[in-house]
Amino acid sequence: NNATSATGISQYYYHNNGKQLTEALHQSLNQLPLPNRGSDTAKYVVLDQVTRPATLLELGYINNPSDFKHIRTAVYQKEIANAVTAGLQSYFKQTMERK
């Protein structure tokens, strides 16, 4: 069934200034139990109308029973929070080192 076949984690950016942020988050999200489908450009409204670095994270699919089993747990939610925090720290560290 195509409606339930999408699985895993994806990261998207639109403007080039969001690529480094997206890649830093991509690296930290690799530790999560769901497969990381990678990062790509996408022309989503939430991305294309911003001027600051921006990324869209898809952290699992609620219509996929396997993904949903993870998404609904406090353990997975904490893993997501920790991974996103680590990715942001990495991004800002890289940004500060370039200055």
Walk through the language-model features, giving the residues of each:
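Active-site-proximal helix/loop segments of hydrolytic enzymes
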Residues: 1-99
